[in-house]
Curated annotation (Swiss-Prot):
It comes from Thermococcus onnurineus (strain NA1). Its EC number is 3.4.25.1. This is Proteasome subunit beta 2. The 20S proteasome core is composed of 14 alpha and 14 beta subunits that assemble into four stacked heptameric rings, resulting in a barrel-shaped structure. The two inner rings, each composed of seven catalytic beta subunits, are sandwiched by two outer rings, each composed of seven alpha subunits. The catalytic chamber with the active sites is on the inside of the barrel. Has a gated structure, the ends of the cylinder being occluded by the N-termini of the alpha-subunits. Is capped at one or both ends by the proteasome regulatory ATPase, PAN. GO terms for cellular component: cytoplasm; proteasome core complex, beta-subunit complex.
Length: 200
């Protein structure tokens, strides 16, 4: 039985005043496009979100787990869990399941104490960075990010770069959509979401 290929492109950028996450909205299965309207960025709290690349069921299970842990932390300590703490928690969860791994690659971004961006692999490898990309189109997206990123970018500049990175990946990676892009910005005021659509 042939394994059906799936794919996506998600990117994260640390800006001067927050975090920008972006992803295509296409869900593919093999050579078929299942939908053009899936959300691949999931809010965990009002200041932290994750992007999804990999098994949808695994990502949804992890998101529910992180939401519960964040609520428990808030209830116990009377303050929100920091982005770094949540990234380390997720890293421990993934590493603890390395013999039966979650088939995911996740970007976690948030602004609790400061803008923080992390990339996690299926075995819990954790890297904090200024920009990152995941999914089948990530080799194309990361090239755009490396070329266009600069320290102290504004949120708007980071949004423009993120859209350009996902669009470029969508033009070269058959499993990444390029017609509609989900963008989430996380600042100290909270999370905002928007969609950018293209006709070509």
């Amino acid at each position: 039985m042939e394994t059906k290929k799936t794919g996506t492109t998600t990117v994260g950028i640390k800006a001067k005043d927050g975090i920008v996450l972006a992803a295509d909205t296409q869900a593919s299965l093999g050579h078929m496009v299942e939908t053009l309207n899936i959300r691949k960025i999931i809010p965990i709290t009002d200041r932290i979100a994750i992007t999804t690349a990999g098994s949808v069921g695994d990502v949804q299970a992890l998101a529910r787990m992180l939401e519960a842990e964040a609520r428990y932390y808030q209830f116990t300590w009377g303050k929100p869990m920091s982005t770094k703490a949540m990234a380390n928690l997720l890293s421990n969860i993934l590493n603890g399941n390395k013999w039966f791994p979650y088939l995911v690659q996740i970007i976690l971004g948030g602004y609790v104490e400061e803008p923080t961006l992390a990339n996690l692999d299926p075995l819990g490898g954790l890297i904090f960075d200024d920009y990152t990309a995941t999914g089948s189109g990530s080799p194309f997206a990361i090239a755009v990010l490396e070329d266009g990123y600069k320290k102290d970018m504004s949120i708007e500049e980071a949004k423009e770069l993120a859209v350009r990175a996902v669009r470029t990946a969508g033009k070269r990676d058959v499993y990444t959509g390029s017609r509609k892009i989900q963008i989430v910005a996380i600042t100290k005021e909270g999370i905002t979401e928007e969609f950018v659509e293209f006709n070509d």
